[in-house]
């Protein structure tokens, strides 16, 4: 390596323990969060995380450390990790270092900015509450998302988190004139490749940027990829004054990567092995997602819940930052009610009459009440049968079952699996359908007629032809 540059510090590797590297500098060591390079061609990148004494620092490797040995020269790059920003990044796929991974030439006119930024000050934040429509009935009616807010997709493995995120990318591209940033943290390489091809086939790649920290990469890279994606999103919000949809899959992998880094750094673990700084690290990321006077970053984040335990510290900390929570139910998935969203466990803080309006609030509350009463009656039905219920309770059960089926929806991103054409439903059409079901206007129709349709009118005789596979 070049040791002739007097303005950049040169050190030597003092110790290597897995992904943790101790480095000694003869002069002043680099500052915290600086990047240093080592290896035969400078291919090993290390981020400084702590200073041990006047001459020694400790860092986490952001790349594999094969071939690294004590005594190797280390060069300070003179700055922190940076990410490319600008219109040149649209329709491209990057890794944590801002290098393209889509087999195309790198963007030639992209700007580069540090991934470490402070959240916007309070005076720049907007306090207006606006609904961010997704085109998905159950979300827009029962747990409306807030423009500039954060929503969590909570669920265990295999209940449809990634499918729901992909559908939102498709719908938002057609409904909102903005930019989508997809951040894959700990993604399987196969899933990232499939997602890229699906989005390209759907024709929404031109207004999208994809950033991946794959599960085979070191924990340091997976920990920093979310900051890189957020830096790209902040450019479109602050410089181009555009609305941004930031999709994160999976925020639990961000916490998990931080836990690995913390363990490697020798920090004392807290409850269930998580890092003691988990709350701070998550807040530093989440508070940068905001609605300002320039634009808004609206974030939808998948949260893997270990063993479906919602009291897990990672789920609890993530949940505290969300303005809406979308809880996916394995039981509903087993019943074929897709999207498998639990309407009673899910909710939104902005679902108040002053924000969403009296009519929307009334319909949502009546719907929840009907579904909650049906849940209470399920045990009675299982033991005694439906015939033992009063006529009023039987009518309530019929309404609830029709509501459950009306809230199913065919997705554009699953057309090639199901053979059913995807449907995008406006909030007004979704509210109208719920209201008509609550008024028993469809009591003479079989409940299956409301399954996997868009508008409620499609279930009526002479309405849109329903796919036979429903």
Swiss-Prot record:
Quote the subcellular location field of this record: Cell inner membrane
**Keyword annotations for this protein?**
ATP synthesis, ATP-binding, Cell inner membrane, Cell membrane, CF(1), Hydrogen ion transport, Ion transport, Membrane, Nucleotide-binding, Translocase, Transport
Q: Which GO molecular function terms does the record list?
A: ATP binding; ATP hydrolysis activity; proton-transporting ATP synthase activity, rotational mechanism; proton-transporting ATPase activity, rotational mechanism
Cellular compartments per GO CC: plasma membrane; proton-transporting ATP synthase complex
Note the superkingdom of the native organism.
Bacteria
Keyword Cell membrane on entry: yes
Q: Which SUPFAM superfamilies match?
A: C-terminal domain of alpha and beta subunits of F1 ATP synthase (SSF47917), N-terminal domain of alpha and beta subunits of F1 ATP synthase (SSF50615), P-loop containing nucleoside triphosphate hydrolases (SSF52540)
**Could you say which protein family the record assigns here?**
Belongs to the ATPase alpha/beta chains family.
The name of this protein is ATP synthase subunit beta 2
């Amino acid at each position: 390596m070049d040791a002739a540059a007097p303005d950049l510090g040169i050190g030597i590797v003092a110790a290597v323990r897995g992904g943790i590297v101790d480095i000694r500098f003869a002069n002043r060591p680099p500052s915290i969060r600086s990047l240093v390079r080592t290896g035969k061609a400078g291919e090993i990148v290390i981020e400084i995380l702590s200073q041990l004494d006047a001459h020694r620092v400790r860092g986490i490797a952001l790349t594999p450390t094969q071939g690294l040995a004590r005594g190797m020269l280390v060069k300070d790059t003179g700055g922190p990790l940076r990410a490319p920003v600008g219109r040149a990044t649209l329709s491209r796929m990057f890794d944590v270092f801002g290098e393209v991974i889509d087999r195309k030439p790198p963007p030639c006119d992209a700007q580069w900015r540090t991934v470490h930024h402070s959240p916007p000050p309070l005076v720049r934040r907007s306090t207006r509450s606006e609904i961010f429509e997704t085109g998905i009935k159950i979300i827009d009616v029962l747990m409306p998302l807030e423009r500039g807010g954060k929503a969590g997709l909570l669920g265990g493995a295999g209940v449809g988190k990634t499918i729901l995120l992909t559908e939102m990318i498709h719908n938002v591209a057609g409904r909102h004139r903005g930019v989508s940033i997809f951040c894959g943290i700990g993604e399987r390489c196969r899933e990232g490749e499939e997602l890229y091809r699906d989005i390209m086939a759907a024709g929404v790649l031109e207004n999208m940027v994809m950033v991946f920290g794959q599960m085979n990469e070191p924990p340091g890279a997976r920990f920093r990829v979310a900051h890189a994606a957020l830096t790209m999103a902040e450019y479109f919000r602050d410089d181009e004054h555009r609305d941004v949809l930031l999709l994160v899959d999976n925020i639990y992998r961000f916490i998990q990567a931080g836990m690995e880094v913390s363990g490697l750094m020798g920090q004392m673990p807290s409850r269930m092995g998580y890092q003691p700084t988990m709350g701070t690290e998550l807040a530093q990321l989440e508070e940068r997602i905001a609605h300002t006077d320039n634009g808004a970053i609206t974030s939808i984040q998948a949260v893997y819940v270990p063993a479906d335990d919602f009291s897990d510290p990672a789920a609890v900390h993530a949940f505290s930052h969300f303005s809406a929570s979308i809880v996916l139910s394995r039981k509903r998935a087993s019943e074929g009610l897709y999207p498998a969203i639990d309407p009673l466990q899910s909710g939104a803080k902005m679902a108040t009459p002053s924000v969403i309006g009296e009519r929307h609030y009334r319909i949502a509350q009546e719907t929840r009440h009907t579904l909650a009463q049906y849940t209470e009656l399920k045990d009675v039905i299982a033991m005694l049968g439906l015939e033992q219920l009063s006529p009023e309770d039987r009518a309530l059960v019929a309404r609830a079952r029709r509501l459950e089926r009306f809230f199913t929806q065919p997705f554009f991103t699953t057309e090639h699996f199901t053979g059913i054409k995807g449907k995008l439903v406006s909030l007004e059409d979704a509210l109208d359908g719920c209201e008509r079901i609550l008024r028993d206007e469809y009591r003479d129709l079989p409940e299956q007629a409301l399954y996997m349709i868009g508008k409620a009118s499609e279930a009526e005789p002479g309405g849109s032809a329903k796919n036979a596979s429903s």
